[in-house]
Amino acid sequence: MIRCIHLWTGDDQQSHFEEGHIALDPGQRGDLLTGKLATASVSFQETKSGGAFAWHTAPARQLVITLSGTLDFQTREGRHFRLAPGDILFAEDTRGSGHSWTLVDDQPWRRAYVILASTASVPFHPRPAGA
């Protein structure tokens, strides 16, 4: 399983999140994998250690794959979650109040942005309540 945080805009126009994972199915050679996702583009970005970004929404429906750096994300409701290397953020909060983030370790945040096609179905599975 690959840890994934789903971030979306609720009917209240607030950003909300839930922790879960990307579902992987058995593949060749004993590997686990997903099917191919329809994407529009992929880009890479690096932010120096100590970086932060004030309140904003996601510019598009996207997957953000953290390669290095540990971040604290916050919603306007005061809820927090952390992203670490290897984690995926499934960002769908493209409107509303948005979120902010701060780097919390001494590493730069290196990440890949995968902009999803409108037809893309992400195999996100939320963590069961109480787990």
What would you call each of these model-derived segments?
Residues 9, 21-30, 40-58, 93-96, ...:
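Conserved short histidine dyad/triad with adjacent acidic residue
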Residues 10-11, 66:
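Short, acidic, Ser/Thr-enriched surface-loop or helix-capping motifs
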Residues 88-94, 104-121:
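A short hydrophobic beta-strand segment most commonly corresponding to one strand
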Residues 32-36, 52-58, 74-75, 81-82, ...:
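Short histidine-centered beta-strand/loop micro-motifs
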Residues 1-8:
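Short acidic, Pro/Gly- and aromatic-enriched capping/linker segments at domain boundaries
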Residues 46-49, 57-73, 114-117:
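Short, conserved beta-strand element in jelly-roll/cupin
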Residues 46, 76-94:
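Short acidic-glycine-tyrosine-enriched beta hairpin
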